[in-house]
A protein has these predicted regions:
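Sec-dependent N-terminal signal peptides
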Residues: 1-8
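C-terminal motif of bacterial Sec signal peptides marking the signal peptidase cleavage site
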Residues: 11-13
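Acidic, Gly/Ser/Thr-rich repeat motifs that build Ca2+-stabilized beta-propeller blades
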Residues: 15-172, 223-230, 271-307, 321-356
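Surface-exposed loop and turn segments in beta-propeller and other repeat-based domains
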Residues: 76-88, 135-151, 189-208, 244-269, ...
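Repeat-solenoid scaffold signature
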Residues: 205-232
Length: 356
């Protein structure tokens, strides 16, 4: 097995003693400049989405609020997603925006009374005064199992303009590999919520055998990557294949069997507990909750193990996205009931891209 780098991370295919171990990379070697706080005082934020005008939208889990961060740095409430039921890890989760003709839609994944669901509603107004037309809410996908934990919740439009939805097993681990169960899956749907053309099982399901996926992003070649919470042993970074079975609950981490696809890299939960991910220059950035760090994995040089930056500097990290001008944005998550909030938490931070 490969030597551990910056913690207990293991890379797929690194069992040969002939492969040299790269030098450990410390956060001080790769992180540049001081962070810029773009927003402070956030309450259990979960997702951040940049807008074309330079602003952003931020979801707050427990209250269902969608906040607008304007390009000039002002923070205001755009609206509240109706029907959000919060409790435990459930509430308002991922956001995505789609423009079609003259319509601009906000998509949101949230907990409801009896399930998790994805809804959409028109995003109205101009930058600086955006609003949610909650009277025109449409259900895109419902019937996703909901529980106090393992709710998944990340949504993103792929290069094919289809909507990808990350779900958790909602504690029903025995059904994560069941194609007829929406939990423990990555779903792929049209913007209206129908099975996307070319789906492997002629259903909403794109991949299965997941425990709790919370990160989705694509490299430049169109490959989908996903982060996944493990149980007690291994968290995972997976390269997603259409129809792929990733083995949960029968396998966690590297199974090396014919009935499941192994992850590309794994971490112990105390060093990762991965949530949102981003791809910047074909490097995957993984936000760690318990790990309180960012993990980076260069998909163009798979023989090099992931390395960590900003370890312990900002507390729990929930989401990460590309920023402007060689920067990236990180959303902290210290007010979710499991962190130790600082005076300005939670925050949206802008950081300079690491070197090397």
């Amino acid at each position: 097995m490969c030597a551990v780098l910056a913690g207990a991370v293991v890379l797929a295919g690194c069992t040969s003693p002939g492969i040299p171990t790269p030098p450990a990379i410390d956060a001080t070697d790769t992180a540049n400049d001081e962070p810029v706080a773009l927003a402070t005082g956030l309450d259990a934020p979960w997702s951040v989405v940049r807008l074309d005008d330079g602003g952003a939208l931020i979801s707050q889990r427990d209250g269902g609020e969608v906040l607008e961060l304007t390009a000039s740095g002002d923070l205001r409430e755009a609206g509240v997603v109706p029907g959000v039921v919060s409790g435990g890890e459930s509430g308002l989760h991922g956001l995505a925006v789609l423009e079609r003709g003259d319509m601009r839609w906000l998509y949101a994944y949230h907990g409801a009374e009896d399930d998790n669901r994805v809804v959409r509603m028109p995003l109205t107004g101009e930058p600086g005064s955006l609003g949610l037309d909650v009277a025109a809410v449409e259900v895109v996908v419902d019937g996703i199992p909901r529980a106090s934990n393992h709710d998944g919740g990340r949504i993103a439009f792929g290069p094919d303009r289809m909507l990808y939805i990350a779900t958790g097993d909602a504690g029903q681990r025995e059904r994560a590999r069941d194609r007829d169960f929406l939990g423990g899956k990555i779903l792929r749907v049209t913007p209206e919520g129908d099975p996307a053309p070319g789906n492997p099982f002629d259903s909403l399901v794109y991949s299965l055998g997941h425990r709790n996926v919370q990160g989705l992003a694509w490299t430049s070649d169109g490959t989908l990557w996903a982060s996944e919470f493990g149980q007690d042993t291994w968290d995972e970074l997976n390269r997603i294949e259409p129809g792929g079975d990733y083995g949960w609950p029968d396998h966690e981490g590297f199974a090396r069997t014919d009935d499941a696809i192994d992850p590309v890299a794994v971490w112990t939960p105390d060093e990762a507990s991965p949530s949102g991910i981003a791809v910047i220059d074909d490097v995957v950035y993984v936000a760690g909750l318990r790990g309180e760090r960012l993990w980076l994995y260069d998909t163009t040089t798979p023989s090099v193990e992931p390395w960590a930056v900003y370890t312990g500097e900002f507390g729990r990290l929930r989401d990460v996205i590309a920023g402007p001008d060689d920067t990236f944005w990180v959303l902290t998550n210290n007010t979710d009931g499991r962190g130790s909030p600082g005076a300005d938490d939670d925050r949206l931070l802008q950081l300079t891209l690491p070197e090397g």
